[in-house]
């Protein structure tokens, strides 16, 4: 089977009154990334919960990570836990993405994405922290997707890449 794990959803589902939830709110409202130690700790805890509840089987399931690793350090620290088969790099014009993310925030009541200035700051964080992750993995494992296209076209591109990887002819 296939299991999708979004680090953003993982953080947004935290109780804002909990230690990790309040830390996430502190960073996300400023457009900053949660420190690697806390992110990895939460990821490992979440994965253990999924495995213990039967939602994920390391022997049977393919895990789609969304939003993690967010830094080269996270990639290095996760290397012992995951075997990366493929990395989808969704690339688009920054201002178009700011508008899209802002619109989604309003529709889905996602406060961490509601302020366009905060979203722009996250793009700066991406350039500084996340873009180097692309250099960590071999180029042969990276596929770039035009995320500036219409959402259905983006989905089509992703499905096409996954079909080639999962069901080679």
Which residues does each PLM region occupy?
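Short glycine-/polar-rich loops that comprise or flank the Walker A/P-loop
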Residues: 1-2, 81-86, 138-142
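ATP-dependent small-molecule kinase phosphotransfer cores
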Residues: 3-77, 107
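Residue-level signature of catalytic and energy-coupling elements of molecular machines
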Residues: 8, 43, 64, 88, ...
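Conserved nucleotide-binding/hydrolysis micro-motifs of P-loop NTPases
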Residues: 10-12, 69-73, 92-98, 150-151
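A glycine- and Lys/Arg-enriched "phosphate-lid" helix/loop adjacent to the NTP-binding pocket
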Residues: 26-28, 77-130
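Conserved, well-folded catalytic cores of nucleic-acid-processing
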Residues: 46-53, 81, 104-107, 129, ...
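Conserved phosphate/pyrophosphate-binding and hydrolysis machinery centered on Walker-type P-loop NTPases
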Residues: 65-68, 90, 116, 123, ...
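NTP-dependent small-molecule kinase module
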Residues: 124-169
